[in-house]
């Protein structure tokens, strides 16, 4: 089994034809955050990924195997939420609440993308955002990290945490009465970009 142990720095220019010929390693976001991983190239070859601790791979990265061969990284399609809003203030509030939980977010033009999470989908809907489930590559802003930590020093912590706790309790069977319909109709035109994918599943359950 070959070992992939190096990543070529983004500022190193490689011939496009050389990269295009390299086999792809298609990984979801969680897998791209792991520095030690048993993986399978798109060719079917099993490989071992052994990179420096803390390495987060991005779509388009080029790796080097122990035999000198190149491997290109591709972001896999995965379940995500596309978050839009009727105005900039609502979208900003949605981004704030996600950031307060250290939720990895990909920022697009008038849209936020995050990993699928029914609890967060419910919270964002209550904030006034439109939430759409889709299957698409996910590449959050560099430096983002997960965890959902609580920040007691934040001025809006009590209100923010109370809302999140209410949603959490309802999704775990305590009280599941909602005053809104989870299904959303989307009449907007699709534009290609970070927040566009085809074959969407509208609404969330």
Curated annotation (Swiss-Prot):
The keyword Cell membrane does not apply. It holds the Pfam family UreE_N. One of its GO terms (cellular component) is cytoplasm. One of its GO terms (molecular function) is unfolded protein binding. It comes from the Bacteria. Keywords: Chaperone, Cytoplasm, Nickel, Nickel insertion. GO terms for biological process: protein folding; protein-containing complex assembly; urea metabolic process. It is found in: Cytoplasm. SUPFAM superfamilies: Urease metallochaperone UreE, C-terminal domain, Urease metallochaperone UreE, N-terminal domain. CDD domains: UreE. Residues 171-205 are annotated as: Disordered. Residues 171-192 have a biased composition (Basic and acidic residues). Involved in urease metallocenter assembly. Binds nickel. Probably functions as a nickel donor during metallocenter assembly. HAMAP family: UreE. Belongs to the UreE family. This is Urease accessory protein UreE. The gene is ureE.
């Amino acid at each position: 089994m070959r070992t992939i142990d190096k990543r070529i720095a983004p500022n190193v220019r490689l011939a496009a034809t050389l990269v295009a010929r390299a086999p792809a390693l298609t990984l979801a976001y969680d897998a791209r955050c792991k520095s030690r991983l048993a993986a399978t190239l798109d060719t079917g070859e099993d490989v071992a990924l052994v990179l420096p601790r803390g390495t987060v791979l991005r779509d388009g990265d080029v790796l080097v195997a122990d035999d000198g061969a190149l491997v290109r990284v591709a972001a896999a399609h995965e379940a995500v939420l596309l978050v839009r809003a009727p105005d900039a203030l609502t979208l900003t509030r949605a981004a704030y609440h996600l950031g307060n939980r250290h939720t990895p977010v990909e920022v697009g033009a008038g849209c936020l993308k995050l990993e699928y999470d029914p609890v967060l989908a419910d919270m964002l809907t209550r904030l006034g955002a439109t939430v759409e489930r889709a299957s698409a590559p996910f590449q959050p802003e560099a430096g983002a990290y997960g965890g959902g930590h609580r920040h007691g020093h934040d001025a809006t912590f009590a209100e923010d945490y109370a809302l999140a706790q209410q949603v959490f309790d309802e999704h775990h069977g305590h009280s599941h009465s909602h005053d809104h319909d989870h299904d959303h109709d989307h009449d907007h035109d699709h534009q290609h970009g970070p927040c566009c994918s085809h074959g969407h599943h509208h609404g969330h359950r």
